[in-house]
From Swiss-Prot:
Gene Ontology CC annotation, any one: cytoplasm
The organism's taxonomic lineage, starting at the top: Eukaryota, Metazoa, Chordata, Craniata, Vertebrata
Protein name: Nucleus accumbens-associated protein 1
Database matches in PANTHER family: AGAP004733-PA (PTHR46105), NUCLEUS ACCUMBENS-ASSOCIATED PROTEIN 1 (PTHR46105:SF3)
Residue ranges occupied by any BTB domain in the UniProt entry: 30-94
Coarse class of the protein's main subcellular location: nucleus
Length: 514
């Protein structure tokens, strides 16, 4: 029997993918162009189909050389995910990790969805350590991005041979997150001297697509694609639209910036950042994507979550603030915040009507509660987040919680994180209201609310504290019970003693008289 010889070349598959990526960056041997909002990305069908179920179904139903993705997908996030398909690595700005997660859900890339979610949650926390972050490799070992190549940055002009440098990859299951050293919008902020505030619109390099066919083929959607898991693309600041400043003039204050009666937090003056005005159509698109993304949880029963019933709260000035149940948002408030609220708030309706905060989350809040949150917050997105969290979680729940679930060494291990579905819905709604609202800021505010709630609850316990000698242990309580049993005998003895003493007092006087 002939012997079989076997030879294995380590990391040969990685080197092939690396060479394919270099060919893609140079536009060599690419057989498909993916168009995202006018930006064209050349790629290989085989690599896309092997990485994404979305593209696999799409290529099975169409042989077109040009594929156009829906408008909800952002070019920057798709570029990063396309690089991941070739290299298995992600590189992004801090704060954009959830945008990538949701885009990966739309493209049905399960590796990012399954392995990256927990990792990105840790990275987005303000208390996370740096163990999960890997420094960027040298520029020579990292393939260039299409944006860099088109802008004329140095790049190889000739295709590299297949026997190219080999990267030593880590574990197949690991997900690397290499934060960029500089953000694309940092330079413009420094030039402006920081006076203009944070701009919600992410600045991306735009490049032309001369190789595109003049007539783009409409994207066919199969049944499997339509029912596939799709994710939200708005978290991280993807809602685009005409920018609008939230900052009021120095001499004018917003008419809708009063504090909520249910708020027990110490709220100082918060800076109001510039936001973006999202249209109803964009809101519906993103909500539809969230609905399809929720279908990832197949076989799981999603319970309906509703906001807490509103209660009239006594304030420190011994007066009751009466809330007005409005049928629709006031015109003055609409002029200030634009179309960034729930679409149904702009039409008149029953104040007790239950509105789904974000389509597909099964998290409901009454029209009156949501409207009062907006009226109280005005243009301040941080206050809006506090109002919404206070609408869903009462004081005791917040006090007994560890916030977003990211613990520090000083946290009580008995504290449980808040309901993740409610947190995600509230965060997403606030992200739609203010696209530049970062995930790390939201986590910090939620943790601060839990801390403040614990302080208030602790103060309410102080007057009811028992003296130390009353909580000594079982011996003292058993002694109390025993003394309770002998109390009648002691009373009878005391009564007889008093009688004897009186008789004793009368005795000598009688003897003297005699």
């Amino acid at each position: 029997m002939a012997q079989t010889l076997q030879m294995e070349i380590p990391n040969f598959g990685n080197s092939i993918l690396e060479c394919l990526n270099e060919q893609r960056l140079q536009g060599l041997y690419c057989d498909v162009s993916v168009v995202v909002k006018g930006h064209a990305f050349k790629a290989h069908r085989a690599v896309l189909a092997a990485s994404s179920s979305y593209f696999r179904d799409l290529f099975n139903s169409s042989r077109s050389a040009v594929v156009e993705l829906p408008a909800a997908v952002q070019p920057q996030s798709f570029q990063q995910i396309l690089t991941f398909c070739y290299t298995g690595r992600l590189s992004m700005n801090m704060g954009d990790q959830f945008l990538l997660i949701y885009t990966a859900g739309f493209l049905q890339i399960q590796e990012i969805m399954e392995k990256g979610t927990e990792f990105f949650l840790k990275v987005s926390s303000p208390s996370c350590d740096s163990q999960g972050l890997h420094p960027e490799e040298a520029p020579s070992s990292e393939p260039q991005s299409p944006v860099a190549q088109i802008l004329g940055w140095p790049a190889c002009s000739t295709p590299l041979p297949l026997v190219s440098r080999v990267k030593t990859e880590q574990e197949l299951d690991s997900v690397q997150c290499t934060p960029m050293a500089k953000r694309l919008w940092d330079s413009s902020q420094k030039e402006a001297g920081g006076s203009g505030g944070n701009n919600g619109s992410r600045k991306m390099a735009k490049f032309s697509t001369p190789d595109l066919a003049p007539n783009r083929m409409p994207q066919p959607v199969s049944v499997a694609t339509a029912t596939a898991a799709v994710a939200v693309v708005a978290v991280g600041g993807c809602v685009s639209g005409p920018s609008m400043s939230e900052r009021t003039s120095p001499g004018t204050s917003s008419a809708y910036t009063s504090d909520s009666p249910s708020s027990y937090h110490n709220e100082e003056d918060e800076e109001e950042d510039a936001g973006e005005e999202g249209t109803d159509e964009q809101y519906r698109q993103i909500c539809n994507m969230y609905t399809m993304y929720s279908m990832l949880n197949v076989g799981q029963t999603v319970e309906k979550v509703e906001a807490l019933p509103e209660q009239v709260v006594l304030e420190s000035h011994s007066r009751i603030r009466v809330r007005q149940d409005l049928a629709s948002l006031p015109a003055e408030l609409i002029n200030q915040i634009g179309n960034r609220c729930h679409p149904k708030l702009y039409d008149e309706g029953d104040p007790s009507e239950k509105l789904e905060l974000v389509t597909g989350t099964n998290v409901y809040i009454t029209r009156a509660q949501l409207m009062n949150c907006h009226v109280s917050a005005g243009t301040r997105h941080k206050v809006l987040l506090r109002r919404l969290l206070a609408s869903f979680f009462d004081r005791n729940t917040l006090a007994n919680s560890c916030g977003t679930g990211i613990r520090s060494s000083t946290n009580d291990p008995r504290r449980k994180p808040l309901d993740s579905r409610v947190l995600h819905a509230v965060k997403y709604y606030c992200q739609n209201f203010a696209p530049n609202f970062k995930e790390s800021e939201m986590n910090a505010i939620a943790a601060d609310m839990c801390t403040n709630a614990r302080r208030v609850v602790r103060k309410s316990w102080l007057p009811k504290t028992k003296p130390l000698h009353l909580v000594e242990g079982d011996n003292y309580s058993s002694f109390i019970s025993d003394t309770g049993k002998i109390e009648p005998d002691m009373m009878s003895m005391e009564h007889s003693f008093e009688t004897a003493s009186h008789d004793g007092e009368a005795g000598p006087s009688a003897e003297v008289l005699q």
